Amino acid sequence: MLLPLAAVLHGCVDNPKASRREPVRSSTSVLTPRPEARQCLAQLALTKASFTPVQDKYYSGGCSTIGTVRLASLRSDTTYMELTNLGPVTCAAATQFAGWARFGVDRAAQQILGARVARIETFGSYSCRTVAGTSRLSGHATANAIDIAAFVLEDGRRVSVLDDWDGGTAEERRFLRVVHASACKRFGTTLGPQYNAAHKNHLHLEADGAQFCR
């Protein structure tokens, strides 16, 4: 049931050669979530995001979608921001994403670009793979990371990480750097074009405790 909140395509390009794992049998508890899960869902509801809880699933190779939701839209100060290509994402990441989108993105767009954000385009969330060059699972392997590709404003302008991080107007470049800096304050790991070539077209936002901002 979609919660109006009163009451993936691909993910980050960590390891494009990594094989996708097939799901294995899993037990679910989505109808009777643990107390901490219920608390997180309640916190997410307070953001007035629209979301649907997702059934827990375990996959081979250590991948999983546990305590996840599907976000339909996020609340700004006056309306809702649409989302594209976003699969299951952990409740914790979704809650951080909701706060960042409203206070770090939409308000920055108003102040710097003179228009509100109508849509946030993503490259997805869950994807079962490792970080490139390592055997360590990516944050996407547990649906704990989101890749942000672009922002579409209410006046139709589209500001993308790929085209506008270096090639946009002065205002667009400033906007992207402000939202990147804001993400660093909310997410444990935030990676952008200045990190490496694999992130030249998106911002990688991960809800972990790493405190790593590049």
Regions found by a protein language model. Name each.
Residues 1-8:
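Bacterial N-terminal signal peptides
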Residues 9-28:
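Bacterial Sec signal peptide processing site at the extreme N-terminus
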Residues 15-21, 66, 72, 137, ...:
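Catalytic cores and adjacent binding grooves of peptidoglycan-active enzymes
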Residues 23-42:
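N-terminal low-complexity, Pro/Thr/Ser-rich intrinsically disordered segments
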Residues 25-31, 87-96, 134-135, 161-170:
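Second-shell loop/turn segments in exported
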Residues 36-120:
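Active-site acidic/histidine clusters and adjacent loop/turn architecture
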Residues 111-143:
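Active-site-adjacent substructure of cysteine-protease-like catalytic cores
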